């Protein structure tokens, strides 16, 4: 699906979508338990993949209405699925479900689309093997299809922290229902650490204890997933909020602003986007009690940013840098190359196609703002929702019309993205 966006000015109120990261974890936590109601979940292609996995393990998922799902879980004992589990394009589903599947007595096979089958899972599979489960890649390259199972009981394991924090999340969530629990030693610096903070925060809401140790984490075994009052409320998604904030900062009307609802504080590292835009000269006001962000247009100046703990913000920051004056230098971004696509290369290529001056290095992306004016053209979404949404924001400030391919991929995390842009006044034409 192509979407065409013309240079536009925006203003008005819009509600942030629920957090994808919290929704994935809440669904799986409810599956590990007896039952739970999830309030304000994100219903998207990725989170529906996690719901189907819960059902494959013997749980049930009922959509009560658009704001509630009720999950009956499998009480820490997933059954062996009767068929493969198709995780589609969701790396989070694959990794979290791989550790869950390793608790089953039999074997589970996980696969997904072409993009997912290129993503690395080797360290998690090796950890499962160390814990006396079965974890292997059918191609023996650490990539899906994956085979997991043999009911691992817990123990001690060492794992790198600089490839994906989802490995740690997967082991913590599964470890709570093992016999022995799991002690995790980090072999490297933990990148994307706020995502593990999200996990620890959510597990606490489900009455599951995690201990931070000198060299990693420990989760005692034999625990039960029991949320307070049987419910869990999903907060707004700051990864998605970043695009709405950027839209206001670069394209709000002279007498207006973009106001974003549902932006309550949480453990999300991507809430750093507020401070980043402020550092670039943006005037972002955050009413934390009301959960509202207000951002008018501003003249932005390039800054230097380390995205080691907020990889999903790289496309947004790169777009802001292309519109700002001066250089925006994005450091510590090698791990951002291992997402749905190589996001470092994709943003360098597509912003370059729009006329931006960009320098790409292995662990760094520099956007030389102010050297050229962005111009509308045909750009590729690279099958990646975050690339698509970031390019859409660039299109708001570009001369002429920009057409973005693969635009249907916003369904992964922000299904109503283009409707939200239109509601704010952007010129959006969807070609289905």
UniProtKB/Swiss-Prot annotation:
Q: Where is it mostly found? A: cytoplasm
Alphabetically list the UniProt keywords: Amino-acid biosynthesis, Aromatic amino acid biosynthesis, Cytoplasm, Transferase
Q: In which pathway does it act?
A: Metabolic intermediate biosynthesis; chorismate biosynthesis
Could you confirm whether the keyword Amino-acid biosynthesis appears in this record?
yes
Instruction: Identify the stretch annotated as signal peptide in this record.
Output: none
What residues form the catalytic site here?
312
Q: Matching Pfam families, A to Z?
A: EPSP_synthase
What family is reported? Belongs to the EPSP synthase family.
Q: What is this protein called?
A: 3-phosphoshikimate 1-carboxyvinyltransferase
UniProt source species: Haloquadratum walsbyi (strain DSM 16790 / HBSQ001)
Q: Which gene encodes it?
A: aroA
């Amino acid at each position: 699906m192509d979407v065409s966006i013309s240079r536009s000015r925006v203003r008005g109120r819009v509600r942030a979508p629920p957090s994808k990261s919290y929704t994935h974890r809440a669904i799986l936590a409810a599956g590990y338990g007896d039952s739970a109601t999830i309030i304000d979940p994100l219903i998207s292609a990725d989170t529906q993949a996690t719901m189907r996995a819960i059902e494959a393990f013997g749980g049930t998922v009922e959509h009560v209405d658009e704001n509630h799902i009720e999950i009956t879980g499998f009480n820490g004992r997933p059954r062996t699925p009767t068929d493969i589990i198709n995780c589609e394009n969701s790396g989070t589903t694959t990794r979290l479900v791989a550790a869950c599947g390793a608790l089953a007595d039999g074997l589970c096979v996980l696969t997904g689309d072409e993009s997912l089958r290129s993503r690395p899972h080797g360290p998690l599979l090796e950890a499962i093997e160390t814990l006396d489960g079965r974890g292997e890649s059918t191609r023996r390259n650490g990539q899906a299809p994956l085979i997991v199972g043999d009911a691992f009981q817990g123990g001690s394991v060492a794992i790198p922290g600089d490839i994906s924090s989802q490995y740690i999340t997967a082991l913590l969530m599964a470890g709570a229902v093992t016999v022995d629990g799991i002690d995790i030693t980090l072999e490297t610096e933990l990148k994307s650490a706020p995502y593990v903070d999200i996990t620890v925060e959510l597990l606490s809401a489900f009455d599951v204890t995690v201990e931070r140790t000198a060299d990693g984490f420990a989760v005692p075994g034999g625990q039960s997933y029991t949320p307070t009052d049987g419910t869990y409320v999903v907060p707004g998604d700051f990864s998605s909020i970043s695009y709405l904030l950027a839209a206001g900062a670069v394209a709000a009307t002279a007498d207006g602003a973009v106001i974003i609802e549902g932006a309550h504080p949480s453990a999300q590292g991507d809430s750093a986007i507020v401070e980043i835009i402020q550092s670039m000269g943006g005037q972002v006001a955050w009413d934390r009690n009301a959960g509202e962000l207000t951002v008018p247009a501003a003249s932005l100046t390039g800054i230097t940013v380390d995205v080691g703990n907020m990889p999903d913000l790289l496309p947004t920051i790169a777009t802001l840098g292309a519109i700002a004056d001066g250089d925006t230098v994005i450091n510590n971004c090698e791990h951002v190359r291992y997402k749905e696509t190589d996001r470092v290369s994709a943003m360098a290529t597509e912003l370059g196609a729009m006329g931006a001056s960009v320098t790409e290095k292995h662990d760094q992306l520099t956007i030389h703002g102010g050297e050229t004016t962005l111009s509308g053209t045909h750009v590729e979404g690279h099958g990646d929702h975050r690339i698509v949404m970031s390019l859409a924001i660039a299109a708001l400030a570009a001369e002429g019309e920009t057409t973005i391919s693969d635009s249907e991929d916003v369904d992964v995390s922000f299904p109503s993205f283009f409707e939200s842009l239109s509601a704010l006044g952007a010129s959006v034409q969807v070609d289905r």
